[in-house]
Amino acid sequence: MNKAKFLEVISGGLIVSCQALPGEPFYTEEGGLMPYFALAAKNAGAVGIRANSVRDIKEIKEKVSLPIIGIIKRDYPPEEPFITATMREVDELVAIGVEVIALDCTLRKRHDGLSINTFIEKVKKKYPQQLLMADISTFEEGKNAYQAGVDFVGTTLSGYTKESKKQNGPDMKLIKQLVQENICVIAEGKIHTPEQARQIKKLGVAGIVVGGAITRPQEIAKRFVDALNKEEKDV
């Protein structure tokens, strides 16, 4: 799928992130659960899926035919980047045919010792037809990655790095800044409500990814519990 077709497919719609990590209730060593989240998303009208790991992506592709933004989360301590952080992960994702590969494009020190610009250059040289999405946390990171040649910039990591401001909702300021620079933005990160998604859509983004607010029941339940506990304390 080329960039124009992907943009056409996701335009105005919802991409649902279907992920579960070790230690979370919906993670199992055997797999098998994420495809049903993806199927539910498809049945609700979602236009795309974001998913983690070769296993989950393969299983999801058997259930739905929606385009997939694929990632592989793999830790490389002491370095912080862990989302498709090396060529090893890129190779694995290309091999299973995901439409878009998302990768950490922050300016933090990397396990492979490369600058993010050099890494992007190497990926594009090896896989010139592969669509790439930059997961970033700041305007500087987003602009840098886009100029380096990625197809889309995602606000995925805003609030999750030392370089970005912690907040409870989506980083509207960052989204606006990137859009105003004519960067192709896929908004993602802490989008908790349909109204927030509607507001983001009006900013002119290329796409919107929602994850925890849909596919992580433990997080959803905790927001309700925290709100109720706060109300009791306020009385």
Swiss-Prot record:
Domain of life the protein comes from: Bacteria
InterPro entries documented for this protein: Aldolase_TIM, NanE, RibuloseP-bd_barrel
Pathway named in the protein's UniProt entry: Amino-sugar metabolism; N-acetylneuraminate degradation; D-fructose 6-phosphate from N-acetylneuraminate: step 3/5
Any one biological process term the GO annotation gives: carbohydrate metabolic process
The keyword Isomerase belongs to this UniProt entry's keyword annotation: yes
Catalytic activity of the protein: an N-acyl-D-glucosamine 6-phosphate = an N-acyl-D-mannosamine 6-phosphate
GO molecular function, a single term: N-acylglucosamine-6-phosphate 2-epimerase activity
Gene3D superfamilies: Aldolase class I
Keywords: Carbohydrate metabolism, Isomerase
Pfam family, one: NanE
EC number: 5.1.3.9
Gene Ontology cellular-component annotations: cytosol
Its biological purpose: Converts N-acetylmannosamine-6-phosphate (ManNAc-6-P) to N-acetylglucosamine-6-phosphate (GlcNAc-6-P).
Entry-linked PANTHER family: N-ACETYLMANNOSAMINE-6-PHOSPHATE 2-EPIMERASE-RELATED
Family of the protein in this entry: Belongs to the NanE family.
NCBIfam families the record matches: PRK01130.1
Protein name: Putative N-acetylmannosamine-6-phosphate 2-epimerase
